């Protein structure tokens, strides 16, 4: 069963919107759900950690500048925000950015994912319930079905819904006006979107990996919200092992917090953070056991590559999509993996990190 996540933002006494989570009330949307949007204790805690304003959002300065201009321009003209496509690796803050947009615009938002929109009536139920200016966030938008995409075309471009009534020669199309809304799509595979859908987004922006100093600020902020004592060097140690990703940084902080509470009952410093992350098999470069296994397979079984994606998936036991979207981006970012038309190859840096001798240096030893 799936539930759409819906947010209303009634004004506070100071005039600023306040965020609050509710289930969608319309019967037509109750079965449209994003699996990750199920409301539980863990998500409520994560909701408290999320920033709700640009001022609280750390990193992604270029993206924030672009969106800040778009928001101010839309407000000055009394228009809705243009449709926005956000792309980049998972965990960089695409969903959070959609929530911030709603907060900055003073409107409500709804969250769903493309796999949940299986039938045309699913997206229809969402669209007809949108209020003027509302934001509809669709995660994994590259996975929309063809029929759902075709319904979105006139909805995005002309704010109308074209419904076919009847069948065969007696069929006719009826157009229903929709409230002007903003569609925010998120994807890890922007190239998988069809051109007609991609071209209907007025703004297309990429989220980049975070720098260590940005992640350090995020860890310190999260620790303060969780009432977890952590030193600057302890936060930095967690940050540099977080793969440039805030979601991972917050997750590692919680694991280190558990370790500190059980083992030392004290403040998280660099030494404690290092001990805890070593226990969880996260090395100083942020590689976990699976990352190291993938690189080891390429080096030991395939002499450093090139290795095809399907072959690597079979050798490691991971599915191809997980390899492409979760592991490869960071390994390529830090220079441990390269992709060629023939397949994946481990770099000299990967050899040295895992304690292997690079092939050219092996020849020099003969």
UniProtKB/Swiss-Prot annotation:
Residues 211-281 are annotated as: Small ATPAse domain (RuvB-S). ATP binds at residues 49-50, 91, 94-96, 157-159, 200, 210, 247. Residues 284-366 are annotated as: Head domain (RuvB-H). One of its GO terms (cellular component) is cytoplasm. Residues 15-24 have a biased composition (Basic and acidic residues). Disulfide bonds: none annotated. Its EC number is 3.6.4.-. Residues 13-210 are annotated as: Large ATPase domain (RuvB-L). This is Holliday junction branch migration complex subunit RuvB. It comes from Nostoc punctiforme (strain ATCC 29133 / PCC 73102).
